[in-house]
Amino acid sequence: MAKQEYKQLPKRSEVHSATEQFKDTIKTSLGLDLFKGLGLTIKEFFSPSVTIHYPMEQLPLSPRYRAVHHLQRLLDSGSERCIGCGLCEKICTSNCIRIITHKGEDNRKKIDSYTINLGRCIYCGLCAEVCPELAIVMGNRFENASTQRSQYGSKSEFLTNEQDAKNCSHAEFLGFGAVSPNYNERMQATPLDYVQEPSKEESKEETPTRSESHKGDENV
């Protein structure tokens, strides 16, 4: 282990008399430290402001920002995307998602209740990642402060408006949990992707026809 060497700084002489205190004050006031602080203050005074008048003004958030959840609908039909599989409820680390379902006449799950306790949620985004239908996603509504300890969110608060989905007034979700736009370019090719199948023209050239094979037999 390397030996650490410490450099001891000279101790500052103690000031006792009033004359020495006055000299020390003048030296500190007219030294470089004062002008450095004033220079920084003047520089920041004339620099452009980085603050905004919240809540009248709000900064744009990233599309992958993790805030209050949002339940999606199909854009064309307006049907709910959630199939009631319960994966979001099982993977939730804070145990804040509660789903109650029943089996319908068509032997498919029907959702009776879907609640999220926003007071317990840590907004990790695991529910959005595990959802196979992209039904639950992370939105950008971060103003969810409440004076009540038991703060629950019902399904109607998170669900997209059916008429907006049918009219396609909103685009497909591109936030946290969605597939990246350039996912094809980022995917790594598997060994099977390098095996190229022969084209039809090459297979015709390599495989002789029946008439040519019969002519070869007659010549023999």
UniProtKB/Swiss-Prot annotation:
> Which InterPro entries does UniProt cross-reference here?
4Fe4S_Fe-S-bd, 4Fe4S_Fe_S_CS, NADH_quinone_OxRdtase_chainI
GO cellular component entries = plasma membrane
User: What keywords appear on the UniProt entry?
Assistant: 4Fe-4S, Cell inner membrane, Cell membrane, Iron, Iron-sulfur, Membrane, Metal-binding, NAD, Quinone, Repeat, Translocase, Ubiquinone
Query: According to its UniProt record, where is this protein located?
Result: Cell inner membrane
Question: Could you tell me which Pfam families the record lists for this protein?
Answer: Fer4_7 (PF12838)
Q: Which domain of life is it from?
A: Bacteria
Annotated residues that bind [4Fe-4S] cluster 1 are located at 82, 85, 88, 131
Q: Which family does it belong to?
A: Belongs to the complex I 23 kDa subunit family.
Q: What is the protein's known function? A: NDH-1 shuttles electrons from NADH, via FMN and iron-sulfur (Fe-S) centers, to quinones in the respiratory chain. The immediate electron acceptor for the enzyme in this species is believed to be ubiquinone. Couples the redox reaction to proton translocation (for every two electrons transferred, four hydrogen ions are translocated across the cytoplasmic membrane), and thus conserves the redox energy in a proton gradient.
Record's protein name = NADH-quinone oxidoreductase subunit I
